[in-house]
C-alpha cells in the first residue's frame, strides 16, 4: 500500500518542481552552479553564491553573497544564510534557521576507516529555529530545534546540542560531547553552567530571542519575495 504524502510534503514537492521548471525556462544556471539542484522559485540567492553537487533550497530562504555550498545539502524554508558561509559534505538544515557570516559547517567523518574513531558516519543535522552565530565552526554536529551556537563557537566531530541549548560565545566542545536540552554550556572545553534555561535567559544572553527573531525575519523574507513576484 502506498504511503500518503502529507499536505506539507506535497506542497514542497510541487514548489520545488515548479522551481526547476522556472529555472530552466529562464535559461541555464549561473556558471558557478554545478550539479543537480532544486531551488524553490521564491528563494533569494545572491549571484555570487557557489553551488556544487546536489543542493536543495526551500521556499523564502535567503542566501547572501560569497557563500559556498558543496555536497548533498538540504536547506529548509524561511531560513537565512549570511555572507561568506561555507557548507560542505552531507548536511541537513531545517526551517527558520539562521546561519550568520563566516560560519563553516562540514558533514564530518565517514565510518571508521582506520584513521578515525568514528564507528558510524557523523551526521550534520541542524533543526528548526536554530541560531548559528558569526564565525562558528561545526564538524559533523547535530543541533536540535532552537539550539544555538554563539560567536566563534566550535563544535568538534559528533557534537550533539539538545533542543533549546546554548553553546556560549568563544566556547568549544570536544569530540562526541553532548550538551543536554535547555542547558547553557561555556568554556574550552565547554562545561554546562546552567540547566533548564528559559526564554528570559536567552534574551539576557543574546539580547534577542532566537526563535522569535528567526520567525520575524523569515516572515519578512516571505513578504519581500511576494512583493518581488508582484512586480514581475
In which residue ranges do the predicted regions lie?
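Right-handed parallel beta-helix/beta-solenoid
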Residues: 69-73, 86-93, 119, 143
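Extended, small-residue-rich solenoid/repeat segments and analogous flexible loops
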Residues: 5, 15-68, 74, 78, ...
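Residues on the solvent-exposed faces and adjacent turns
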Residues: 47, 53, 65, 71, ...
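A short mixed-secondary-structure module that forms the rim of ligand-binding clefts
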Residues: 78, 82-84
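Glycine-rich hexapeptide-repeat left-handed beta-helix
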Residues: 25-38, 94-232
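A structural connector/turn signal
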Residues: 34, 46, 50-52, 70, ...
